[in-house]
Amino acid sequence: MLHPLLRHLPLALALALCAAGAAQAKNLVVCTEASPEGFDIVQYTGAVTADASAETVFNRLLAFRPGTTEVIPGLAERWDVSADGLSYTFHLRPGVKFHTTDYFKPTRSLNADDVLWTFQRALDPKHPWHASALRGYAYFDAMGMGELIKSVEKVDELTVRFVLNRPEAPFLRDMAMPFASIYSAEYGDQLLAAGKQGQLNNQPIGTGPFVFKRYAKDAQVRYTANPDYYAGKPPIDNLVFAITLDPNVRMQKVRAGECQVSLYPKPEDVPRLKQDPNLAVDEIDALLTTYIAINTQHKPLDDPRVRQAINLALDKKAMLDAVFGPGAASPAVGPYPPTLLGYNHSIQDWPHDPERARALLKEAGAENLRITLFIRNGTSPTIPNPALAAQMLQADLAKAGIQLTIRSLEWGELLKRSKAGEHDLSLLGWAGDNGDPDNFLSPNLSCAAAESGENQARWCDKDFEALMRKAREVSDPAERAKLYEQAQVVFHEQAPWIPLAYPKLFNVRRNTVQGYVINPLSNNNFATTSVKP
């Protein structure tokens, strides 16, 4: 445990004192933008939570090549797919070790039982661990995995077979996503026997590059390098996520060397940061969408005319110029960026037309509309200045006769309340997890996701659902593209969102940091990162 005196010292100084006791310890401090919601990753969809668990503690059967959306082997060293696309057989790496900690000491290596435990926990309501996910299986349910997966079978100690009820084009990509992280069945059995199921969300065990040490909410998460990592021990010895909500403070810390990596600077600061000889700025056209979900279950927001009016009232260009700055984001028209399959370039964005908005509101009997917008109290790559965006929306809506109240909430609280349907509007962002269009649509716009609350527009449209489902089942890219183009027409006409932006992704690091790769999927993995003396 950290000495009481050290708790009151700045993070960098505390690390320096620790390093003095450990001579050549190599530390990496990353300034992150928010606290993780927990560490039982199957319960959550937030990118911050995935970085703190899936990218550090856990692995999946498959992985993405760093900096790309190419699927590569993970815990499975190879796989076979049946000719009918209904059977996927994964061959596990031998000798992969789970973490050894003060609270768990494994007696065996990874095997098929761990894969079965992981997926049957979510699939089977009678599984002894099923009810332990107090927030449910957010991604799993939103993507319809329960109805997709017919069975998960143990072929032998190192072979697992998934049998599907229907073909699923993005299934291999899905198996590389955070929600598919593989847990230790032995650790689960230990906690269950002790009646300590809640510990899984506070003290995770995985096979990943870093071993969890401790978490201080809104302060830091600490890890040590996994000496037994199957891909080789990471170059650094200690990894610290220093939770720093204010992007200005994050930049001050990286300039001062208190952090070696600082995530998500304000776009307007990027040109100045690039001029600092001690810093390097990484940027990429990421798979990101910024949007405002409109709660279609609240009257009169259940009327598409009202939702269209809200879209028409917004001066989107002015907002993007002010919030993101020149060249840092392009206007969003649909639910996913134009780099993905089936983006419909023929759809024209809603123009800024407050008079037409007023007319639609009058036609719908929704004049003098009063609604509430939820925003986060920190920043993120999808929305670098939530308060400014909210204020600009408020002013634009007022010109159309709509009174908007703004509520600023801590990120975890915003997600909790929005998923419970308390909002009228909620300012959100989505980071693609696998490079497939379905990853934007199913978790955020499907009927299953509306029921679970992940679809925060609570929009369930049978025509959209049918197109999306068919696109998942066909393997031909051209046919899938046509289906997605049609689905986007339905989305545009029904207007469950205000699509705002497709932002670029920026991260800042000291130029002594090597081996860090910025990812279009917005995940941050430090397994290969090193720091020069």
UniProtKB/Swiss-Prot annotation:
Keywords: Peptide transport, Protein transport, Signal, Transport. GO terms for biological process: dipeptide transport; protein transport. Disulfide bonds: none annotated. InterPro entries: Peptide/Ni-bd, SBP_5, SBP_5_dom. One of its GO terms (molecular function) is peptide transmembrane transporter activity. It holds the Pfam family SBP_bac_5. Residues 1-25 form the signal peptide. Part of the ABC transporter DppABCDF involved in the uptake of various di/tripeptides. Prefers dipeptides with acidic residues at the C-terminal end. Efficiently uses tripeptides. The complex is composed of two ATP-binding proteins (DppD and DppF), two transmembrane proteins (DppB and DppC) and a solute-binding protein (DppA4). Five orthologous SBPs (DppA1-A5) are present in P.aeruginosa, which increases the substrate specificity of the DppBCDF transporter. Belongs to the bacterial solute-binding protein 5 family. PANTHER family: D,D-DIPEPTIDE-BINDING PERIPLASMIC PROTEIN DDPA-RELATED, PERIPLASMIC BINDING COMPONENT OF ABC TRANSPORTER. This is Di/tripeptide-binding protein 4. It comes from Pseudomonas aeruginosa (strain UCBPP-PA14). The gene is dppA4.
